[in-house]
A protein has these predicted regions:
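Bacterial N-terminal signal peptides that target proteins for export
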Residues: 1-9
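Bacterial N-terminal signal peptides
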Residues: 8-16
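Sec/Tat signal peptide C-region and signal peptidase I cleavage site
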Residues: 18-24
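Alpha-helical scaffold domains
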Residues: 29-30
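Short, aromatic-enriched amphipathic alpha-helices that serve as compact interaction elements
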Residues: 34-50, 64
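Short solvent-exposed beta->alpha transition segments
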Residues: 52-108
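Exposed beta-sheet edge and beta->alpha loop/turn motif
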Residues: 101-157
Length: 157
């Protein structure tokens, strides 16, 4: 009985420790990450959404969402539903992407993002990041404020 209890406890402890380590692998904003790199981090994570744990790509993307954006989308479970919905599901496990700078200032940067989804259809997005200017741990960090609805560009075939 004691051995069985100890084994069960060990399995639960190992599972908890393993989950904690994988979530620790996610990147968090810091003021040394450039605007285009924020988008690269988000797109690379979404490209392999379940690589670290279920929905790790979505959670990685959430980490770089501007607080105002998070207020609009609601908590993380709502954000996950939004990304998995019709408007943005093509971002999940997409095959490739390109990021092209459209314009910037010291406070914002806008990019055109074209992704090739797993159905081999291209989609274009306008993606904007802004430098967080309020006091706190995010001060000076570039964070996503806007991702447009996708514009389908057609098939790659």
């Amino acid at each position: 009985m004691l051995k069985k209890l100890l084994l069960t406890f060990s399995v639960v402890l190992f599972s908890f420790f393993n989950i904690s380590l994988t979530k620790a692998d996610l990147l968090f904003p810091n003021n040394s990450i450039f605007p285009a790199d924020v988008i690269k981090i988000q797109l690379n994570a979404l490209m392999d959404n379940d690589s670290k744990f279920k929905d790790s790509g979505i959670e990685q993307t959430w980490n770089f969402a501007h607080p105002n954006n998070k207020k609009n989308t609601g908590p993380l479970p709502n954000f996950k539903m939004m990304i998995k919905g019709n408007s943005y599901k093509m971002l999940l496990n997409h095959l490739s992407h390109t990021i092209t700078a459209l314009g910037s200032s010291n406070e914002w940067a806008q990019f055109e993002v074209v992704i090739l989804d797993k159905e081999k259809i291209y989609h274009k997005f306008n993606w904007q990041v802004e430098k967080f200017t309020m006091d706190g741990p995010l001060r000076g960090c570039w964070l996503t404020t806007v991702v447009s609805n996708p514009i389908p560009l057609g098939s790659s075939i």
